[in-house]
Each structure stands twice: as structure tokens, then as C-alpha cells.
Amino acid sequence: MNIRSNPETTRAAVTTGALPSSKKIYATPASAPDLRVPLREIILSEGAGEPNLPVYDTSGPYTDPTVVIDVNKGLPRPRTEWVKQRGGVEQYEGRDIKPEDNGNVGAAHAAKAFTAHHQPLRGISDAPITQYEFARRGIITKEMIYVAERENLGRKQQLERAEAALADGESFGAAVPAFITPEFVRDEIARGRAIIPANINHGELEPMIIGRNFLTKINANIGNSAVTSSVEEEVDKMVWAIRWGADTVMDLSTGRNIHTTREWILRNSPVPIGTVPIYQALEKCEGDPVKLTWELYKDTLIEQAEQGVDYFTIHAGVRLQYIHLTASRVTGIVSRGGSIMAKWCLAHHKESFLYTHFDEICDLMRKYDVSFSLGDGLRPGSIADANDRAQFAELETLGELTKIAWAKGCQVMIEGPGHVPMHKIKINMDKQLKECGEAPFYTLGPLTTDIAPGYDHITSGIGAAMIGWFGCAMLCYVTPKEHLGLPDRNDVKTGVITYKIAAHAADLAKGHPAAQLRDDALSRARFEFRWQDQFNLGLDPDTAQAFHDETLPKDAHKVAHFCSMCGPKFCSMKITQDVRDYAAGLGDNEKAALYPVGHAGMTISGTIEDGMAQMSAKFKEMGSSVYLDADKVKESNKALS
């Protein structure tokens, strides 16, 4: 349902309430009984004969009926106490908000400011601040315990098939365990193979983990532009995206009210929020890349870190010496951040200040535990440009920068393409693992063909499923509006569902031990014609039921043993059920006709010819119909027995 909890404001309503036949539940880790780890339990029908199914849940408090949602106040901030209890931080006043933070917007167009103010925290001295630093020192944090419980989906007792699932998959060298422990989480973070993006100032965050030995995650992009959208719409899109399964959200706003938009999103977001700081820095210098300076950019990093942004995309790999490599490309430089830095480098004929000041960037981000998302500013924007020297030269530099960031105590993931045909995808994954020390890979698709404007959620979903299988840790969604316009909330949902499919398909292929439980539950519901369970076990129950109701809308149709595709007489699953019922009621002589001599189904001696003749006579006796009434079959079998 939609609610407007404070009618005195102009804040837009956001979507709340549980998904169909679902309820919010919480798991409690044995090692931290004070933690409440959210899950969604899908409630199956009484006739299912199996337990309800817990699934991973990204929706935050918005689907918990016991929580009163007021976007004007924001979400609760329990993580702030975790951070303070660990020590090594100080609370301070923070920088003042400046007019340029919101693009010098005039009063007529200024968005309402978020009224609740929280003094920011920052790290002090050499005490560990980041999850990477704690992990390297052998310390298991509450965040690590939290994500371990989340990854196991609160169902340790249901993972008896875990070893079989792992053996069935092809993980391409990933080390997915049968069960995730907090110690395993700590070890993966310490190795740099996983990150928990969790700024110490994002107290509303429900921690999650990104790494190839965990569930494949997806990101949804939102954000305004200079020509469209508002703060209200972006907050609504964020809540809508996480409802359908977005694990993280990036605010890519480039228009007015950037600071205010981001504050509203962060204070109401239970998932990590990422940004591309160069976008806001550009707005502060009238949109002219040539006017950018290190000082301006640094101030922007501090501004966003104090607000609580969990990861920054930083295009530090776009170096002056690589720009000429893009000259022969079909589509040149397609990354906004990459093109901004390329223009700055050429205008000043200097090395990028993101590269030359990288050490300082690390020191700044460490104080807040902002994770790096090292941007691929030279990613290919067409399949013709895939895997060229410009793309891979930048990737090699990102590998060098990763080692510097680790040495400084920062968490790191690496961004990837882009537009890559299917036969060139795996080399991207393999090269990234080699060059970047197995740091998590985070890709935009990739799009596998360039011929489908309006359907690029599909062209990219194909590539996303493949690279997720090969080891990519997080997939950035693409919506139907890609290359065409700013996505609305319908596009956001389509993009999220498409990428949930891709991520889940990758987990199945890798042999993730918990992945197939939901598939099997839905398959059983499908075979048993439990229509409501089919809808509710799916990623999008509303759409599934709407499609079914277009042709079979009555309640009686929800228990029918057919759908409108095949009708009552040609449903393969109905026929199979009839065959099973029929076989179960056969006498011994009849079974002899169905099974070869020596088959386990043949329990007494007898000639096959006699059995076949008997069954032929019975077929004629019952009307020579291929499709038989089950009750008549049972009566006939009783007469024969």
C-alpha cells in the first residue's frame, strides 16, 4: 500500500506492505543474539505439504507491518551504536552545506531539506576503521556476523543438499562453501575478495556483502537529471527498487538539488548507496570539466562521506597516456566520468588528478570506510570496441590502484563493461581476477549486442548471467530506457527483475548451495497446479497472476489443472499426473504389459503379449479415448483386482 505518514509535508508516498503471501521474519545469529537479520518468508498454501520458504530480503523496514514509516524522519540508525562501541571514531560538526552543493539552485526550485541532522563520525588515529582493517587483524565485526546469517538465508537445517549442489555447479575457481560462517566472511574480506560497503555514517544500513563466493548481487541506478525527475520521485524509486530485490542503489543525480536528493535517499535507505562524486563536482564548476580542481573534488568527497555514501565510483584509471587509444573506436569514450576526466587531461595536458592524488583519496575514504568502486571510464560502448587496448590498459591500472588502496586499509571493488559479445565475456572475468587480485568485479551487463534499443535489459541480462556465472560479484542493472531516457519506476522494476533472474541463474550455475531451493519449490507447485504458490514463489507475483488472470480470472481457475496455453486436454503435467494415478492402480498382469521382462515394475511372471492384449481390450472397453476420467479408471481397476 501507499501511505503519506505526514500530511503536513509535500513528501511523496512510498510503497510499503508485504509482497503477496509473504511476511517479514528475522533470524538471530547465535554469536550475536542482539542482531535481527531480515528475511522474507513466502507462505505456501495448506495443500503444499511443505514448510514455508525463507528468501533473501532487501526491502528493509518498508515491508514490516510493525514499523511506522515516515520518510520525513528517516529510518532507525542501529548501526551507529555498533560503530561507536568499536571505538576509534569521533563525532564532529562536519562541513557546512554550501549553495554549490545543490548546484546553486534558486529558492524557486530548491527542494525541501531533510530536517533531521546527524553529526558525522570519522576515524581517528591508527585504530581500525574499515571492515578490511578489522578483517586483517582477525576481528569479526557485527557486520560480518550479520551478512553471514543473511547469506545462509536463515535455513541451515535445509542445506543438507549443499554438497551435492556445489558438486553439480561449475564455479570456475570460486570457493563457495556449503555454509557461510562469520569467520569465512572475515577471511574473504581480509583477502580482498569481498567487501561490506558500509560507511560509518550510514546508520540506517542493513549490511550486505559483495564477493564471488557469495550470492550474486545486483545494483539499481536512480537519480535526477538536468531535465527531469524530483527528490520525491527518486526516494520513491529507491524504495521501489529494493522492494523488488536491488541489493545496492546508486544515486547518479546530475541536475539540481544533488545534495538534498542524496540526503533524503540515504536517510531512508537500508541498502548501500553509491555515487559518482565527479558528477556533483562538475555541477559545482558550472558543468565545465576544464574548471575542475583537486580541491573541489576533495571537498565533494568529504561532503558525501559525511552524509554516509557507502561506495564511490572513482575513474582514477583514466590516464592521459591512454586517451589516444580510444581515437579509433566506433563509439569513443562512453563513460560520463571517463569523458569528463579525459577532457580535463587533454585541456591541461596533465595526468589525471584522480590518479596523482590517489593516496590522499585513500586516506580520506578510510576515515569513513567508504568503499572504492574503481570506475571503468574507458569501457567499450559498442561490441566493436570490446576488449581493446584502451579497456585493458585501464584495467591493468585499476589492478595497481587496488594494491595501493588495500595497503591504505580500504575496501575495493572493480567496475567492468559495458558492451561485450558473448564469446569475449569470459576473458574479461579472467583478466580482472588476474590483474586485480580477485577483488570483486561489478559490471554493467555486459550488453551482448547493439541492435535492440528499448530491449537492452534483455541484451544485457544475457551477458550479466554469463559473467555472473564466471565470477562477477555484482551486476549493475540496465533498464529498457538504456540509451533512450531516464528510467521511471516501471523501468526500475523491469530492470531489477531482469537482473534478479540473471543473478539467480548465475548462482544456480555456480552451484550455490541454497539457490535451487526456490526453483524446486516452484516446480513442485507448478506440477501440483498450486497456482497461488506458483505466483507467490516467483520474483514478481503481481505480474504472474495478472498474466494468468487475463484469460482465467475466476477463483475456480486457481485450482484448475490446466492453463490457457494448452487447455484441459493437452496439459502435459495433467496428463503425467493421470498416467501416474493410472499406473498406481494397475494390477500385476497389467503392469506386466507396461514393463520389460526383469524391470523393477514387473512383480510377477507373465508374457508381455498377454498383458498387451489385456490392456488393448480394456482401452476399447472404456471408450477408446486417449484422455480418461480418473474415477472410471479406479472403478475399472477395482473390478479387475
Swiss-Prot record:
Its EC number is 4.1.99.17. It catalyses: 5-amino-1-(5-phospho-beta-D-ribosyl)imidazole + S-adenosyl-L-methionine = 4-amino-2-methyl-5-(phosphooxymethyl)pyrimidine + CO + 5'-deoxyadenosine + formate + L-methionine + 3 H(+). The keyword Cell inner membrane does not apply. It is an enzyme of class 4 (lyase). Keywords: 4Fe-4S, Iron, Iron-sulfur, Lyase, Metal-binding, S-adenosyl-L-methionine, Thiamine biosynthesis, Zinc. Its cofactor is [4Fe-4S] cluster. The keyword Cell membrane does not apply. Substrate binds at residues 221, 250, 279, 315, 335-337, 376-379, 415, 442. Gene3D superfamilies: 6.10.250.620, Radical SAM ThiC family, central domain. Zn(2+) binds at residues 419, 483. Pathway: Cofactor biosynthesis; thiamine diphosphate biosynthesis. Pfam families: ThiC-associated, ThiC_Rad_SAM. GO terms for molecular function: 4 iron, 4 sulfur cluster binding; carbon-carbon lyase activity; zinc ion binding. Binds 1 [4Fe-4S] cluster per subunit. The cluster is coordinated with 3 cysteines and an exchangeable S-adenosyl-L-methionine. GO terms for biological process: thiamine biosynthetic process; thiamine diphosphate biosynthetic process. Belongs to the ThiC family. Catalyzes the synthesis of the hydroxymethylpyrimidine phosphate (HMP-P) moiety of thiamine from aminoimidazole ribotide (AIR) in a radical S-adenosyl-L-methionine (SAM)-dependent reaction. Homodimer. This is Phosphomethylpyrimidine synthase.
